[in-house]
Structure formats: structure tokens, C-alpha cells
Amino acid sequence: MANRENTCNIISKMTKTIRSSFYILCLLTVTLVACDDDIFGNSQSQMVVDGWIEDGGFPTVIITRTLPITEDFVSVNNLGDYIVKWAKVTVSDGVDSVVLTGKYDNNYFPPYIYTTGRMRGKAGHTYYLTIKENDNIVRSVTTIPVNAPDVDFKVEMRSSNDSLYQITACLSDSNEQADYYQIFSRVGVNTSQYSAAFLGSLSDATLGDYAEIPVYRGKALSDSVDYTPYYHISDSVSVKIASVDEDSFHFWSDFTNNISLSSNFFLSPSNNIYSNVKGAIGCWYGMNPIEKHFVIADHK
């Protein structure tokens, strides 16, 4: 009986992984690639870059390819072929250059990353990303902002008769310079990967010197129909609010809007998503973050 239960659990996890792969690759195809009247005529697979470096952290890059929209059948079992595993990925701070090592890591999705322990991000520094795959060369540049956000948090019940809780970020910004922020959230302890929080791309041009910002749960494409942006009792929640540069802000704003504006991603808005990557789509972004961890308790 135990063996049967273990087998069912394994099959369930495999099915969830396959579905998540399908959803993510379809999103990258539908929202990152411009729509065209001849949807089958001009469809080509493109490289997608999801890379970041934060103050005090190591660079991490995930590289995939879009699933091209064609008239031919594409088996879900072949989606692993769209993870790029043999690229040469280099990060430079303008003085030193480091080649990142590709490896499998189940703490991320897709579970293959390029990283290194030989370079840490520093606030105020600029970092150059170069990706070489066959004859293709992809480049991007980002800067880690000098200042981390000045932020406090509070956790409150949504209402007196509700079992859901809301996390609020109390953000102060008295700098005269333009500042941009991105909120990420993570529920659970079995992953290292954060999701961009729902409506979590912020500019101080609209915030003023002080603002209270709801920290909504990140919305993944594999979420069920009963998704809620709030948190349940006993949820283990990690929140990251990061100062980012303007390019990163535009990318995350476009990306999260495309997800949040569509309950069915097959009918999502066809707007192109901003990218700071030359030769591919996606984003290479520097962050100066503040992280906070919560376990949601019953305050009734």
C-alpha cells in the first residue's frame, strides 16, 4: 500500500511539473513574442533569459527557449528540450570576468541554472552579461542600485470574519532621485525561487515620500482557479522588496501586467514585454533587496 502511495505521489509531482513547464513555455511564446496576422508563418523559437544579481549575492541565470506556435504537434514530453544547458555564460563587473557553471538545481524552475561562487554583487556596480550559444551572442547590462528600500512590514487579518491575511509594506522614500522597486513573494520552504508579486512593480513617481503597499501573493500560471492574492494561517511567507534600475522596472511591470490582466493566458494581452537583453528576450536585472520572513499566525 505504501509503495502504491509513493508511486501516486511521484506521478502527481511529474504531472504538475509537466503542466508547469507547458504553462510557462506557452506564456513566453504568447506574451513575449509579438502577435502577427500570420501566426504560423513567422513563428520561431527565441532564447529567453531570466538572470539576476543582487547586492551580496551570486549571479544566477536561467535560459530557455520559447515554444514556437506551429501547425505541427508538439509533445509535452519534449518540453525539456527548450531548456538551454550548453551555453557559455559570462558575467563581468568591468574589471573581472567569470564564466558561470551550468547545473541542475531543484530549488528553481526550470531546474537548471548557471551560477558561480566566485563573484558577488555590490551596490552601485554595473554588471555585463554575455551568453554564447553556437553562433549566437546575447548581451545585457544592469546596475545594482546604491540604496536598498527603507521599509517596514505589518501583517493583518483581512476582516474580522476572514481566515485570510494581508501583508503590507510601509515604504519610505525621501530621495530626490528616481527610484524603482519590485516586490517578490514566496510561500513555503521547498524552493529558493521567488515569484513577482501581483501588482508589485513600483515607481516613486507615484508613491510619494511614504506609501503603504499591499504585498500580494505571486501568481503562477500553474495556480488553480481558487488562487487568492492573500495568505492563509500557517503559511510560511518570504517577502523580498528590491530596488531595481529603470529597465528592470519596465520589464517586471509589463510581465506582471500580462499575467494579472488575463484569467486565461491563452487570451492574454498581446503587448510585447520590455526587454533589456540584446539578441534574446527576457531580463538581466540587478537588485538591492530587503528580505523578511513570516509565519502567518491566527490573530483571532
Language model segments and positions:
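Acidic, Ala/Val/Gly-enriched low-complexity intrinsically disordered segments
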Residues: 2-5
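N-terminal hydrophobic alpha-helix used for membrane targeting or insertion
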Residues: 25-26, 54
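A sequence/structural signal for flexible, mid-protein segments enriched
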Residues: 35-300
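Bacterial N-terminal signal peptides that target proteins for export
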Residues: 8-23
